[in-house]
A protein has these predicted regions:
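Contiguous, often N-terminal, cationic amphipathic patches that form binding interfaces
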Residues: 1-48, 53-58, 62-103
């Protein structure tokens, strides 16, 4: 049996103060990375952020389209869509802010 492969839409904001998953942005997820959008550094930072979030090797995260755009399609190998949604929701700063206000 082959590993699950799932595509994910992202809206990337490069050159920020910290790398984080912000929350939903329409049908995509908004992420921020500290790297500038120069020479693929922001793309590399996006791949690292997602690999860390899902505990995947870097080779399991690939940018399928949008290499030079803010809107990207990412392919994740080894994780299904339901788990992706749960992990992104729990990792998002918007969700963390809601949890902080409830306590």
């Amino acid at each position: 049996m082959s590993a699950a492969t799932t595509r994910l839409r992202l809206r990337v904001s490069p050159g920020n103060g910290r790398a984080e998953i912000v929350g939903r942005h329409g049908d995509a997820w908004k992420v921020r990375v500290t790297a500038p959008p120069e020479q693929g550094r922001a793309n590399d930072a996006v791949v690292r952020l997602l690999a860390d979030t899902f505990a995947l090797p870097l080779s399991a995260v690939a940018i399928v389209s949008g290499h030079s755009a803010r809107d990207k399609i990412i392919e994740l190998t080894g994780v299904g869509p339901a788990l992706i949604e749960r992990r992104l929701a729990s990792a998002s700063s918007v969700d963390r802010g809601r949890k902080d206000r409830r306590t």
